[in-house]
Amino acid sequence: GSVDYRHDEWGVDVTISGSQKGLMLPPGISFNAVSTKALEASKHASMGRAFWAWDEIIEMNKTGYWPYTPNTNLLYGLSESLDMLLEEGLDNIFARHERLAEACRAAVRAWGLEIQCVEDGRHSPVLTGVMMPEGVDADQVRKLIYENFNMSLGTGLGKLKGLMFRIGHL
């Protein structure tokens, strides 16, 4: 529900997402799309599996059995969010996300800050990474924004922790 993504058309082998990714839901459901090629490769893989095997899950789906209690509240929420997305229209949603993303990037540029993106024009329509000037702790900026404006910004991940923050604009 966030970006135009075409698993089959683009020849992607495995796509994994979650209910919190553009579907207006809290975390709790995982969505998996697996190509025939990936399923076949999985059948011949020699690496042991501690948790997940595609073929076992596909067999369980055929019978309606699932190895755990599903989060029915999220499934009802998913049904509603999908109705809302289809009512607005996916092309309209994608265009809205692009507009909001560009507005966010324009604000960041107006603040005189650097946008964390390797290639200009390849920005994400769902979040903007904002680099802090040298000597400014991004996590302290996040804390100030949260305390003063009740806005939660994402932290920098890995080597970028403390150097940047992330603004989600879905």
PLM feature spans:
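Structural motif
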Residues: 13-14, 30-31, 105, 151-152
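Conserved PLP-binding catalytic core of the aspartate aminotransferase-like
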Residues: 114-148
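Active-site C-terminal subdomain of aminotransferase-like
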Residues: 22-106, 110
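Conserved PLP phosphate-binding loop immediately N-terminal to the Schiff-base lysine helix
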Residues: 1-14, 18
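Short coil/turn connectors at secondary-structure junctions
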Residues: 10-12, 26-29, 149, 161
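Fold-independent oxyanion-binding glycine-rich loops
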Residues: 1, 18-20, 27, 34-36, ...
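Conserved PLP-binding active-site segment of the aspartate aminotransferase-like
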Residues: 129-134, 152-170
